Amino acid sequence: MAQNEELTAEAVEAEETLTSYTSESTSAEDAPKKERPALTVAGAAVGRRKEAVARVRVVPGSGKWTINGRTLDNYFPNKLHQQDVNEPFKILDLEGAYDVIARIHGGGISGQAGALRLGVARSLNEIDVDNNRATLKKAGYLSRDARVIERKKAGLKKARKAQQYSKR
């Protein structure tokens, strides 16, 4: 019995020690939620990545995606590409608030997904610069990824791959 009292006394003392180091901070639920004005404005932009070019229109709606006349699930069957494309809406808490209409050509699947994400982010930035720009910029969604395939050089098999060289 005495041991239990000692353990509880130690536990209470440890709890008091720990609480002395913590601060009173507001949790995410207590923080006042910033009200966004209801926007009925459409935005349009162009996104590019590698060889892919995406012309994107974002209009107020129910969250429907139309890419070259097909749905998002149909055009990008890979869930990673679907998530990648939808990130600008997630980070701004605007999922389901806008419909996306896009025309994409050139490049491969990954390049097209990157181009579409940039186009969507630029469109959302155009709609409401004051509220959206800082968040999108911090996440890196407004930056064009300038990496492209290096050209093949004469005398080499590929861009950098050369014939094996023997010094002796």
UniProtKB/Swiss-Prot annotation:
InterPro entries per record: Ribosomal_Su5_D2-typ_SF, Ribosomal_uS9, Ribosomal_uS9_bac/plastid, Ribosomal_uS9_CS, Ribsml_uS5_D2-typ_fold_subgr
Pfam families reported for this sequence: Ribosomal_S9
Disordered: annotated span: 1-36
Domain of life: Bacteria
Gene3D superfamilies in the record: 3.30.230.10
The UniProt record lists the keyword Ribosomal protein: yes
SUPFAM superfamilies on file: Ribosomal protein S5 domain 2-like
Keyword Ribonucleoprotein attributed: yes
BP-aspect Gene Ontology terms: translation
Gene Ontology terms: cellular component: cytoplasm; small ribosomal subunit
Keywords: Ribonucleoprotein, Ribosomal protein
Biased composition (Low complexity): 1-29
One annotated GO molecular function: RNA binding
PANTHER family with a match to the protein in the record: RIBOSOMAL PROTEIN S9 (PTHR21569), SMALL RIBOSOMAL SUBUNIT PROTEIN US9M (PTHR21569:SF1)
Family from the record: Belongs to the universal ribosomal protein uS9 family.
HAMAP family given in the database record: Ribosomal_uS9_B (MF_00532_B)
Protein name: Small ribosomal subunit protein uS9
